[in-house]
Amino acid sequence: MANFNLDNHISKTPDFPKEGITFYDISPALEDPDVLAQLMQDMTKLAADFQPDIFAGIDARGFLFSMPLALALKCGTIMVRKAGKLPGKVLEESYALEYGTARLSMHASRAVRDKKVVLCDDLLATGGTLA
């Protein structure tokens, strides 16, 4: 796709979910098959540089990207969920949002120690999820 600019395919809503915060909606990019194909091609090239062992999709829209990336690079993927969504023993981590804090969790049995993990989320606003 010549002159591809992803920003042209993301809608922005100012002051949502609260004043001073801009909500970035990726839905328009996902609805256009040409944009989606270009996005996945670009993300696959970028992720391949890291030579990942596994991908981790952040709940929930990160799942949209982690699975096709894992398939393209012949890796597995795990789901990192919002706190309280998984039964059994879990590992949890808190992170700061631009409007508060949140927790993520994953099953403690998921073997990611000593592996190269690429985290997938739907956007990067503050970096709080990845901190």
Q: In which residue ranges do the predicted regions lie?
A:
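PRPP-associated nucleotide enzymes
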Residues: M1-A131
